[in-house]
Regions:
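A short, surface-exposed alpha-helical micro-motif characterized by mixed small hydrophobic
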Residues: 105-107
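Conserved ABC ATPase signature
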Residues: 38-42, 46
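Catalytic Walker B motif of ABC-type/P-loop ATPase nucleotide-binding domains
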Residues: 63-66
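Hydrophobic anchor residue at the start of the ABC signature
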Residues: 52
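Conserved ABC ATPase "signature" C-loop
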Residues: 117-118
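Conserved ABC ATPase "signature" region
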Residues: 16-33
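Conserved catalytic motifs of ABC-family nucleotide-binding domains
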Residues: 59
Length: 185
C-alpha cells in the first residue's frame, strides 16, 4: 500500500500502481510476498527498502537520502548501500547521500561535499577530500578506517606519504607493493 500510495494520488490506476509496486519491490531486492505483510513484521532493513521503493514509485530524477543505514547491522548497511549504488548506476538517478560514515563515502561516492557550519568547506573526489585528512579533523570528521590504518603504518615505519588509499583493498595492494620493494613491515 505504501509503495502504491504516491502514484495513486497522482492519478495512476490502482492496478497499474500495484503492478509497479511488484516490480519495484523486486528492484530493491525484496520478495514479492513482502507486499502482503504487515509493516510491523519487517526488519529495519526491509522497511528502508520498502520506503525507497515508495520513493522510486514517484519516478524521481534525484534521490536524496539522509543517513539511510543508521541503526542497521553491518550486513544490512552494506546491502542497503549496494542497492542504492546499483539503483544509481542502473537508473541513472542523481543520488545525494547525507552520511557521517566515511567508509560509505569512500566506497560509494563519486564526489564529496563537506559542510561546516552551514557552508561548503570542501568539495572533490573521495581521494581528494580524504587526502586533506588534517583539515577534515578540524571539522570534526575522521577519515575511513583504511586510510587511518595506512597513516599509522606510514608513521610507525617512517614510510613516505603516498597516494591516498581509501579502501582496504587499496591498503592490501599498497602493503604488497611496499613489501615487494623490500620494505619490512
Amino acid at each position: 500500500k505504501d509503495i502504491a500510495f504516491g502514484p495513486m494520488n497522482y492519478g495512476v490506476s490502482e492496478e497499474e500502481a500495484k503492478q509497479q509496486a511488484r516490480e519495484l519491490i523486486k528492484l530493491v531486492g525484496l520478495p514479492e510476498d513482502i507486499l502482503t505483510r504487515s509493516p510491523f513484521d519487517l526488519s529495519g532493513g526491509q522497511m528502508r527498502r520498502v520506503a525507497i521503493a515508495g520513493i522510486l514509485a514517484m519516478n524521481p530524477n534525484v534521490l536524496i537520502l539522509d543517513e539511510p543505514t543508521a541503526g542497521l547491522d553491518p550486513r544490512g548497511r552494506q546491502e542497503i548501500m549496494n542497492m542504492i549504488y546499483r539503483l544509481h548506476k542502473e537508473k541513472g538517478l542523481t543520488t545525494i547521500l547525507v552520511t557521517h560514515s566515511m567508509e560509505d563515502a569512500a566506497m560509494y561516492a563519486d564526489e564529496l561535499i563537506v559542510m561546516n557550519k552551514g557552508t561548503v568547506a570542501m568539495k572533490g573526489s573521495p581521494r581528494e577530500v580524504f587526502g586533506q585528512h588534517t583539515q577534515l579533523k578540524e571539522y570534526g570528521l575522521d577519515v575511513p578506517e583504511s586510510l587511518r590504518f595506512m597513516l599509522k603504518l606510514q608513521e610507525k615505519f617512517q614510510l613516505e606519504a603516498s597516494d591516498t588509499v581509501i579502501t582496504f583493498s587499496e591498503v592490501v595492494e599498497k602493503v604488497q607493493h611496499l613489501m615487494q620493494q623490500g620494505e619490512r613491515l
